[in-house]
C-alpha cells in the first residue's frame, strides 16, 4: 500500500518582502565590490594617521615634540614615559578625580535618555492616542535645532523661578552640579534616540504584536517580553553613540557644570593640560590616550551589538 505525503504549502513572498530581499542583495553586491573595499581602506588610513601621530607624540620627549613633527620619529626614534608619568602621577594633574567624574556623568547620561526614548518610541510606534503623529513630527523637528542655540535658554530655566531648579543649580549664582549635566545630556539625546528606536520598532512584524494581544498580553508585557529582546542590538548601538558623545563632551560640561571642578569631567582637565598658551601639548597627547581607555573597552565589549544595531531596520521595503 502506497502512502502519499501531503504537500506542504509554501507561502508566497509578498511584494514588500521581495523588494526588501532585492534591495538587500543589491546592497550586499555594492558593499562587497573591489571599489568599495578600496574606498574603505583609504578612509581607514586617512582616519588612522592623525591618531597614529598623536600616539607617537605621547611617547616622544618634550623637546622633540616642540622641535619637530611626529613623522621624524621614523628616522630618529626615541621613547619616554615621562609624559604619561607627569599626567598620571603629577601633583598638578590629578586625573583620577576627573576620571571618576566622567564615569559619574556618563553612566546616568546614557541610561536616562535611552530608557525614556525606548518607552516613548514604543508609544509612538504601537499605541494610538490623540495628536500622536503631530507630536512625533515635533520630536523629529527638534533634531534640527543646534544644541548651542538652546544652551542659554536652558540655563535660564535652571536658575530662574518659577520654572527653575534651584535645588539642582546649587544657588542663585549658578554653581552647577551632576544633576544639571545629566538632565542636559538627556534632553539633547532624546529626539534622535526616539526617532531611531521608533523606526526600528516599526520594522517589527505586526503579526507578532497581534499574536501577543490575542494571548492577552498588554502593552507592558509586549514591551518587556517582545520589544526589548528584539531591540537589544539597536539599544546597544545607540548606547555606544551616546556614551562616546557624553564621554568626549566638553561644551555641555563647561556650561552646565558652572565651572565647578568638583563635577568637571576628564575633558575639562585635558583642555587645561596644554597650558594657557598651548605650550604643554605633549602632556595633552598622553592625557588623550588615557581618556581613550574606557571608550575603547566599551566599544570592544559591545562591538557585535553595534554592528547588528547599525544594520537593523536599514533595509525597508
Regions found by a protein language model. Name each.
Residues 2-317:
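A hydrophobic, multi-pass inner-membrane permease signature
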